[in-house]
A protein has these predicted regions:
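Preferential activation on post-signal-peptide N-terminal prodomains/segments
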Residues: 1-226
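A short, compositionally biased
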Residues: 84, 321-323
């Protein structure tokens, strides 16, 4: 909390987002104007298989009219106080009127999850609720971000993140990877809109200079719906950064490092590793559909890292880290 919001005021979500009578009346007036103009699908949700509108504007109007009856004339903000070990969510309002969602939780396979996401820019300009940061996907539909379009260099972004990590008191995770990132939201017509470019910066636990391998999966998934095993979510620390600073942060499931199981472990030679990879790459992709046969895989880096080995049938709360080539 102090690392990000030492100067912020924290308010409960319910008190911050409650709709006043004036706000609800504005929404009702807009919906009723749509009806008067014959626009029964103002959000372009379309129709179902029977030709009926997916969005029922009349039902929505009725719901807002009911909300209006009990809505307050003005908001009364309630201060929020984080409590360790319990679910907590709030809005953090900064001195420059920018705002952040702030959530702490512990549930299921997540021993700890801390999430921060900007909700409003400086001056209080709201960011669409469905806006989310994601990695640049090298899609032909997306223009690749550049340092110029972001307005911030990678080194500057790394420095901002490093300062926050130090304030968080995290010393056993280090910078491991980065990628360009884009912030997207769906417009009123359900088309995707770009709300900015930035960087994704990841930190990973590093032991004697070797990082724990970062994976696309977050862990915590069952092998199948009938599985009864306890799942294990992975440790991660991820930031999205743009010219205005930290836009989003997720910190999950910190590990506790135990004892060394085997001293001086020997790895296969690199040439042997490459032969195994070349063989297994073909085997693991053998059942791909015909059009996948033309896919080309470009390997731009090979890294020594720790792989997580987890045996829930033996112990659902500990695992082993083994050095592997990625």
């Amino acid at each position: 909390t102090n690392a990000f919001f030492s100067e912020a005021k924290l308010y409960t979500m319910d008190s911050y987002y409650v709709k006043t009578k004036d706000e609800i009346k504005k929404t009702l007036d807009e919906l009723k104007e749509d009806v008067a103009n014959g626009n029964l699908d103002p959000y372009n949700y379309g129709t179902d298989d029977d030709g009926n509108y997916v969005y029922d504007i009349y039902e929505d109007i009725e719901t807002w009219e009911q909300e209006y009856e009990t809505a307050p004339e003005k908001k009364t903000l309630t201060e929020a106080k984080p409590v360790a070990g319990n679910y907590f969510s709030c809005i953090a309002q900064m001195p420059d009127d920018s705002q952040y969602y702030y959530m702490i939780s512990s549930d299921g396979s997540d021993t700890l999850s801390v999430k921060i996401k900007k909700a409003a820019n400086k001056g209080g300009e709201k960011i669409p609720e469905d806006a989310m940061w994601c990695d640049y996907g090298y899609s032909e539909e997306e223009e690749k971000p550049t340092e110029e379009s972001i307005g911030l260099s990678l080194d500057e972004a790394k420095k901002l993140v490093k300062e926050k990590v130090e304030k968080m008191g995290i010393t056993d995770l280090q910078f491991s990877n980065w990628n360009y990132a884009v912030c997207k939201s769906f417009e009123g017509d359900n088309s995707s809109g770009n709300f900015g470019n930035g960087y994704r910066i990841d930190y990973a636990r590093t032991i004697n200079g070797v990082p724990v391998t970062q994976t696309i999966a977050d862990g915590g998934a069952l092998e199948d719906m009938d599985s009864t095993m306890e799942t294990w979510s992975y440790e991660s620390l991820c930031f999205y950064v743009d010219k205005d600073g930290i836009e989003s942060m997720t910190y999950s499931n910190p590990y506790t490092i135990g004892n060394i199981k085997t001293e001086n472990l020997n790895l296969l030679s690199f040439s042997e590793i490459m032969k195994i990879y070349e063989k297994m790459m073909v085997v693991t992709n053998a059942d791909n559909m015909q059009y996948e046969n033309s896919r080309v895989y470009n390997i731009d880096r090979i890294v020594l890292g720790y792989a997580r080995i987890y045996e829930p049938s033996t112990d659902a709360h500990t695992g082993i880290l083994i050095p592997v080539w990625d």
